Amino acid sequence: MKRVTGFPTRPDMVQQLLNVGFDYYNLPSSDGSHYWSDNVAYEFTLAEIDRIEDTTNELHSMCLDFAADEIKKGDYENYHFTELQKQLIETSWRNQEPYLYGRFDFGYDGNNLKMFEYNADTPTSLLEAAVVQWQWLEQIEGLKHRDQFNWIHEELIKHFQFLKQQSGKTDFHLSAMQDAGREDWGNVDYLADVAYNAGWNIHQLAVEDIGYNSETKKFVDLNDQPIEMLFKLYPLEWLSHAEFARHITTAETRFIEPAWKMLLSNKALLAKLWARYPNHPHLLPAYFTPFELPKDLSMWVKKPLLGREGANVFYYEKNNGVEFAAKGSEHSTFYGNSGYVYQQKFELPSFDGMYPIIGSWVVGDVACGMGLREDFTAVTGNDSHFIPHYFVP
């Protein structure tokens, strides 16, 4: 892996980005730079791509096996689930409710490929990974005979067709919070377009506009149309605290992602996987308390179980018990109440002062592409940039 700079800006870059719905390309970072640039990319070898793909498939399979065992045992210790959340998890698993996608975040230093977390419920940067970076590869000068680990779009089409055939339904609703911003809604718009091309009748609405008809005992949209299939770019742990959450198990709406994904999107997964697969080459040691940390490893990352966008991340020095806020992490009491997990600190490589992480996508059960985000700090947060990639066949 290497960072390559100096690519020319397409003369019509802005129009090309807008053509594919990427109207948030110019989200500003603190230094004034934009979320997207044509001028930078990461280059990989075919062997590196094969390794990332194989690792993603392996870890996804491990996570599914883990979820099955946790639900069978009813072992929800350390997750801080409510009784309703436990019920939703078990009901959705028992009903074999379908799932769509997820994104593994990896650290890679050229030798070690390590899982940081699994964004199994509400991952974003999907439009960027599936469409925008592929458009860049096709249009940028000087990259003939290069390829990209990316058939995300094709897998999404296939999976939406599968969902239609499996469910026997015709209408698909997609939602996010009304004020979620263009990044979230851009991802929802993209998935709506994919679903439409897979044969679904599409309806979009804000999460706040989801209603419940007490006579039909179904969730409905603003037109009182039953919501049978619902993609929601809104965390399950938040949705389960909504007033209508008590009706989820009886309303016959299929939520995507399903409630059992709460087991995988919660960072308790990191410690649980390490206990289940100790010394796995692609996992980092992780524990729930500082008292469990091995003495031979001094530096740890303290992560909130339900944090997002690098929020509320601390560094913890085992040798002296000192804890301090990680540079680049925004801190809020909102995320600190969920509990924490301690994960061994992994030294990300710095390229021109930027720290990249790999986001490897799973659609259904297929690893099918990746995108990279880089930031000025080792914690990837709201200042990050999305960077395209390519490999040399």
Curated annotation (Swiss-Prot):
<feature type="binding site">
    <location>
        <position position="343"/>
    </location>
    <ligand>
        <name>ATP</name>
    </ligand>
</feature>
<comment type="function">
    <text>May be a ligase forming an amide bond. Shows ATPase activity.</text>
</comment>
<feature type="binding site">
    <location>
        <position position="105"/>
    </location>
    <ligand>
        <name>Mg(2+) 1</name>
    </ligand>
</feature>
<comment type="similarity">
    <text>Belongs to the glutathionylspermidine synthase preATP-grasp family.</text>
</comment>
<keyword id="KW-0479">Metal-binding</keyword>
<feature type="binding site">
    <location>
        <position position="310"/>
    </location>
    <ligand>
        <name>ATP</name>
    </ligand>
</feature>
<feature type="binding site">
    <location>
        <position position="117"/>
    </location>
    <ligand>
        <name>Mg(2+) 1</name>
    </ligand>
</feature>
<keyword id="KW-0547">Nucleotide-binding</keyword>
<feature type="binding site">
    <location>
        <begin position="103"/>
        <end position="105"/>
    </location>
    <ligand>
        <name>ATP</name>
    </ligand>
</feature>
<dbReference type="GO" id="GO:0016874">
    <property type="term" value="F:ligase activity"/>
</dbReference>
<keyword id="KW-0460">Magnesium</keyword>
<dbReference type="InterPro" id="IPR005494">
    <property type="entry name" value="GSPS_pre-ATP-grasp-like_dom"/>
</dbReference>
<keyword id="KW-0067">ATP-binding</keyword>
<dbReference type="GO" id="GO:0046872">
    <property type="term" value="F:metal ion binding"/>
</dbReference>
<protein>
    <recommendedName>
        <fullName>Putative acid--amine ligase HI_0929</fullName>
        <ecNumber>6.3.1.-</ecNumber>
    </recommendedName>
</protein>
<feature type="binding site">
    <location>
        <position position="303"/>
    </location>
    <ligand>
        <name>ATP</name>
    </ligand>
</feature>
<dbReference type="Pfam" id="PF03738">
    <property type="entry name" value="GSP_synth"/>
</dbReference>
<feature type="site" description="Transition state stabilizer">
    <location>
        <position position="103"/>
    </location>
</feature>
<feature type="binding site">
    <location>
        <begin position="378"/>
        <end position="380"/>
    </location>
    <ligand>
        <name>ATP</name>
    </ligand>
</feature>
<dbReference type="GO" id="GO:0005524">
    <property type="term" value="F:ATP binding"/>
</dbReference>
<feature type="binding site">
    <location>
        <position position="267"/>
    </location>
    <ligand>
        <name>ATP</name>
    </ligand>
</feature>
<keyword id="KW-0436">Ligase</keyword>
<feature type="binding site">
    <location>
        <position position="119"/>
    </location>
    <ligand>
        <name>Mg(2+) 2</name>
    </ligand>
</feature>
<dbReference type="InterPro" id="IPR016185">
    <property type="entry name" value="PreATP-grasp_dom_sf"/>
</dbReference>
